[in-house]
């Protein structure tokens, strides 16, 4: 007789272990599972645990050569989703040894690599991950983090201001640099390459880097403040990306940028290491995130992508606005904003946080609010995001009727007015419009901006609900 029982057996016999007590070193995952009709929750949950760890569809004799008990993922808890008959949350624990140290790429390949195409489930969404300190400690994380960035820039006690240069495609390098200079001179801290600006025929990367560096140094000398422009180093190969980052360092600029989802985690982690070694800040754009996170019952929630970025490394990341054209749901957005900035975040299901997350000493990431925001949103943004954030106004700067520099002035005046009002104890949520109106009496630039955008709102139902 053979030494193992051949054939197909139910996953739940091996991978559903409700009595399992999770270890401090386990990586924990919360999946929203929509099973095929007729598949019981325990079997579907166990199937997810199996397919994302040691399992395959049939028993194999080589199982006898290893200790499955030591290496298997376990579905240890199942709970219903309120209001959704056909869905449930499956909690899965993965032993730490299943993952390569310091590789977000490997973590994702294991946890979400194969199982999402799996037949026993109709749809699957990874809602959250608990990353144990034992694993976090194998990552460098953000190149610098929030405090070091403030010290480098000498900017304290307020959110930072940015602006994406528009039109995003089509400007020549010289005109692009001019737009950068105008915004920085007017009072912004940063300007930004759009995520799709890499190195196209109308503007090659080296020319853009040169003219933007000139704009940075000229505006710095005129304003006496430290300025930056997120130079997008994203490229078709890792080698080319690093080459661009090296050139940025040689120019002496403070910050570069990367599209971490389209560029990939391997490239992103390499760039983050380079940035820490060479004193560059790293701005992260999340282009392509909605492909992964927008569907409510399939994909991976953005809070998972945000945690992954904090491990891979970045000093800023776009995180939705709560107001404006890319509206996130407020509590959920604030949940992952805290996961980006804080050292320790308590489990809180009302904010979509499924696990208590202890980041130990990993530096924090500044959330960037960007997309359809303008001066009238400033009080709400200051109130919601607090000091440790970057508020980015693209059209909200360049669309000011008098031009870029006055548009930048308007944003800076509005921000300073909001910060002062808050520090004086006024309620930004209630008195926001009044605060902006008062400030505009002293600033014609702000008054002009207020006039243009007095009625603009982008109002759609949020897609993401708990």
From Swiss-Prot:
Its cofactor is Mg(2+). It catalyses: 2 (2R)-3-phosphoglycerate + 2 H(+) = D-ribulose 1,5-bisphosphate + CO2 + H2O; D-ribulose 1,5-bisphosphate + O2 = 2-phosphoglycolate + (2R)-3-phosphoglycerate + 2 H(+). GO terms for biological process: photorespiration; reductive pentose-phosphate cycle. Gene3D superfamilies: Ribulose bisphosphate carboxylase, large subunit, C-terminal domain (3.20.20.110), RuBisCO large subunit, N-terminal domain (3.30.70.150). Mg(2+) binds at residues 192, 194-195. The record marks 325 as: Transition state stabilizer. Signal peptide: none annotated. One of its GO terms (molecular function) is magnesium ion binding. Binds 1 Mg(2+) ion per subunit. The modification N6-carboxylysine is found at residue 192. Its EC number is 4.1.1.39. GO terms for cellular component: chloroplast. Belongs to the RuBisCO large chain family. Type I subfamily. This is Ribulose bisphosphate carboxylase large chain. The gene is rbcL.
């Amino acid at each position: 007789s053979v030494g193992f029982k051949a054939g197909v057996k139910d996953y739940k016999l091996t991978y559903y272990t409700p009595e399992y007590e999770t270890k401090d070193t386990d990586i924990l995952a919360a999946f929203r599972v929509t099973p095929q009709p007729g598949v019981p929750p325990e079997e579907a949950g166990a199937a997810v645990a199996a397919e994302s760890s040691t399992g395959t569809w049939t028993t194999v004799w080589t199982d006898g050569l290893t200790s499955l008990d030591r290496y298997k993922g376990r579905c240890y808890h199942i709970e219903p989703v309120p209001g959704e008959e056909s869905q449930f949350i499956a909690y899965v624990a993965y032993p730490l040894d299943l993952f390569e140290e310091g590789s977000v790429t490997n973590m994702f390949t294991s946890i979400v690599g194969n199982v999402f195409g799996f037949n026993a489930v109709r749809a699957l969404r990874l809602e959250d991950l608990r990353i144990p300190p034992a694993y976090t400690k194998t990552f460098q994380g953000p190149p610098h983090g929030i405090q070091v960035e403030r010290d480098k820039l000498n900017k304290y006690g307020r959110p930072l201001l940015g602006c994406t240069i528009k039109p995003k495609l089509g400007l020549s390098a010289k005109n692009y640099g001019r737009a950068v200079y105008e915004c920085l001179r007017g009072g912004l801290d940063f300007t930004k390459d759009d995520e799709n600006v890499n190195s196209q025929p109308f503007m090659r990367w080296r020319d853009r880097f040169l003219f933007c560096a000139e704009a940075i140094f000229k505006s710095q000398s005129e304003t006496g403040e430290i300025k930056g422009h997120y130079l997008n180093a994203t490229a078709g190969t890792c080698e080319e990306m690093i080459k661009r980052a090296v050139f940025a360092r040689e120019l002496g600029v403070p910050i570069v940028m990367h599209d971490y989802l389209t560029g990939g985690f391997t490239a992103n982690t390499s760039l983050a290491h380079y940035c820490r070694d060479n004193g560059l800040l790293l701005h992260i754009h999340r282009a392509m995130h909605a492909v992964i996170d927008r569907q409510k019952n399939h994909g991976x929630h953005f809070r998972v992508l945000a945690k992954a970025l904090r491990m891979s490394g970045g000093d800023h990341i776009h995180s939705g606005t709560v107001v404006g054209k890319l509206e996130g749901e407020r509590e959920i957005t604030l949940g992952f904003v805290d996961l980006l900035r804080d050292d320790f975040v308590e489990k809180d299901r009302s904010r979509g946080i499924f696990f208590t997350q202890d980041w130990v000493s990993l530096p924090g990431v500044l959330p960037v609010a960007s997309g359809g925001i303008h001066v009238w949103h400033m009080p709400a943004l200051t109130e919601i995001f607090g000091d440790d954030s970057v508020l980015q106004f693209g059209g909200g700067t360049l669309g000011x009727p008098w031009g870029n520099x006055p548009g930048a002035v308007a944003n800076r005046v509005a921000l300073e007015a909001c910060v002062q009002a808050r520090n004086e104890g006024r309620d930004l949520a209630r008195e926001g419009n009044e605060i902006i109106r008062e400030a505009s009496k002293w600033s014609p630039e702000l008054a002009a901006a207020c006039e243009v955008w007095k009625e603009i709102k982008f109002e759609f139902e949020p897609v993401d609900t708990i």
